[in-house]
């Protein structure tokens, strides 16, 4: 599918509002994130003080970066999403099975329900790893995500044509080919999918 991304004035953003009194940009739902300015002072940085805009997550839930694992012919495979984001270097990047803030997952945008979300809240799925990790603090203010890996023992079905089951070796080989693998999949792969993890159970 063809995508079109064009620059528009901030005043023209649909459903986003500039609060002149507070000097921030917010979504009309009061969810997602806030664009706000910060003045920083730190003596041991390149400069001792600076101003910059930040994206600040609304609420403290953060987001979920989730991977579904399933053994195919006794070999662990991971459900990977070929996901489009407008700011991606090459538009489509390989991403975890589930990726989004709680505002996205709660469908504040009134869009489609995530096809994988329910798997993470069913009792017949085993949690392999669950850990809160931080985001890039240079641009995102105190943002965190829940890295969540689950084991699925059923038939390895695909939620849609966007998804594919890959082994850790295949993911590692794709990482070596540049920006095709997105940062969240890189992070969860290198942080949690060590040899003892993928061979367990």
Whereabouts are the PLM-identified features?
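Compact, glycine/acidic-enriched structural inserts
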Residues: 89-125
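NUDIX/MutT-family hydrolases
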Residues: 162-180
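Conserved small/polar residues in nucleotide/adenosyl-binding loops
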Residues: 191-197
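An N-terminus-focused feature that recognizes amino-terminal "leader" regions
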Residues: 1-54
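Extended, acidic-biased charged interface segments
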Residues: 115-165
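Core of folded catalytic or high-affinity ligand/protein-binding domains
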Residues: 43-90, 96-99
